[in-house]
């Protein structure tokens, strides 16, 4: 009993101190541009119309397909889900005991009946809708042997009440990149899109430790 009284406050304290999410930091090395892969252009003399140092051809496709190239991701995400469940069951038991007789005399005190009934009725409804619109410019960090581009990038907005950030990673086919170096987020495979913030506004939308304490799955009520 004493051990239970000691462990219960410790478990409940851990439930309330649980962090809702890891704090995201700026200048993450994972999202840094691949600057070490950019080679300086060789400066050579040329004519007035043609400059060899400017590595571009009239017939060359300017869409992103190399490491270090830049492309813009058009965010067009919309999800909607709903779920409904209903369960009910019941159980009823009846049992009666007759009055026994001993030597021709009825023992009324030993007679009676037993009955039991249990009912359960539960229902649940869940609905969720998310929408994300906007754009973010990312860099090509790797080109796979089959030509698929590994893209990664982030955007930070510093506001007067905190910071907001957006991060995008995933795989893009070079054929899905438009001529203006843009690609829809719906064309990104293994997409990881994060949009959140930190600061006063983010803290106002986050549940406090006491709320998380009462809403934790280990809470007995």
Curated annotation (Swiss-Prot):
Keywords: Bacterial flagellum, Cell outer membrane, Lipoprotein, Membrane, Palmitate, Signal. Its main location: membrane. It is a lipid-anchor. Disulfide bonds: none annotated. GO terms for molecular function: cytoskeletal motor activity. Coiled coil: none annotated. This is Flagellar L-ring protein 2. It comes from Yersinia pseudotuberculosis serotype I (strain IP32953). The lineage of its organism: Bacteria, Pseudomonadati, Pseudomonadota, Gammaproteobacteria, Enterobacterales. The gene is flgH2.
